[in-house]
Amino acid sequence: MTDIDYKLEAVPATRIAADDIDKTFRSSTIDLISGALGGKVLGFSDEWFAEAANLLTPTAPIRQPGKMVYTGAWYDGWETRRHNPAEFDWVVIRLGVASGTVEGVEIDTAFFNGNHAPAISVEGCFSQNDDEVLSWKGERGGWETILGVQECGPSQRFGWKLENPTKKQYTHVRLNMYPDGGIARFRLFGHAVPVFPDNTDAIFDLAAAQNGGVAISCSDQHFGTKDNLILPGRGKDMGDGWETARSRTKGHVDWTIIRLGAPGYIQNFMVDTAHFRGNYPQQVKLQAIEWKSEGEPGADSEGWTEVVEPIKCGPDQEHPVESLVKDKPFTHVKLIIVPDGGVKRLRVFAKRAV
C-alpha cells in the first residue's frame, strides 16, 4: 500500500511462513502483550463488531458458524465498522511486562474472510503515563515504528521477524489496521526487561516471564504449553498449565527447561498442580545448571545438578520445597515430571548472582 499519508519507517523484516511462526519465536521469546501475562488494551478507534481485547487472548481463535449478536455475526477477534474515514483504525496496548524489546510480530486473521484487515503496522513507545499515550489517539505523538506497513490476507497467520531486534525498550504498542476490518489475534514476540530490586539479597521469582524467564524447550506439550508454567497467578482451569500426553513406556519421564531472567542463587521452589486433579505427576524432580556455552542447554547436557529431593505430588495444590544448593549460581532450571501429567506453575525463588 503506497497511498498512505501517515508515513512509517521501513524497518527491515522477514516474512515467516505460518507453519514456522511457533518454532521461530516460541522457544526463545515470549508474547509480551498476552492477556495471560497481563497485557491490556487501553484504547481503540472502534470495536463495533468485535472487541479489541480479543486480540490478546492466548489461545487460538475459534469459530461459531451461525452465531449472531446485536451487531451481526459473532467473531473471535477485533472488528471495526466499514467505511473508516481515517487512514487506519488503531488499538493501544500496554505490555504485560514492565518493558520489553521486540523480535517479531504475528497477525492472525483466522475466520475473517471478506472482512479481514488488508494491511497493518505496529508502533511502540516508552512511557510511564497511560493517559499521555492515549491522548495521541491515531496521531504521531511519541510513537516509533516497530514494523512498517505489511499486507495481510483472509483467514491465515502472518509472521514477521525483525532483521534487527529492537534495542529500545517499549511499554506500549499501537496496532494500526488499514483502513478497517478484522484481526483475530496479535502477538508481539520479544524479551521482558524486568526492573530488579536494588537490594541484591532480595528473593524473587527468577523464572517468571515478567522477570525475564523463558521456557526454552520441553519433551512434550500435548495438552498445555510449557510457556504457561511461568505465567502470573494460578490460572483459571486445566487449560492454562503444562500438560503432557499419557506415557505407555516403563521409566518414561517428561521435562521442560526454563532459562532464568538472570543468573541466581536459588533458595526455594514452588511446584503448583492447581486444577490438575486426576492427571498430576506422581513425582517431580528439579535440576539446575550454570550454562556458559553457546546456545542453550539440552536435557542431556553435562552439568545438570539435582537441587531438591524428589517431590511426591498431590492434586490441585502448591508444593513448596527448599533448594539443597543455595551457594552456587544457576542460569537454567529443568523440571522433570514422573512419568507424565500436568503442572500449572513453577516458581524459582532466588537471589540474583551479581
Swiss-Prot record:
GO terms for molecular function: allantoicase activity. GO terms for biological process: allantoin catabolic process; purine nucleobase metabolic process. Induction: Induced by uric acid. Repressed by nitrogen. Disulfide bonds: none annotated. InterPro entries: Allantoicase, Allantoicase_dom, Galactose-bd-like_sf. The keyword Iron does not apply. Its EC number is 3.5.3.4. It holds the Pfam family Allantoicase. Keywords: Hydrolase, Purine metabolism. Pathway: Nitrogen metabolism; (S)-allantoin degradation; (S)-ureidoglycolate from allantoate (aminidohydrolase route): step 1/1. The keyword Hydrolase applies. It catalyses: allantoate + H2O = (S)-ureidoglycolate + urea. HAMAP family: Allantoicase. PANTHER family: ALLANTOICASE, INACTIVE ALLANTOICASE-RELATED. Utilization of purines as secondary nitrogen sources, when primary sources are limiting. This is Allantoicase. The gene is alc-1.
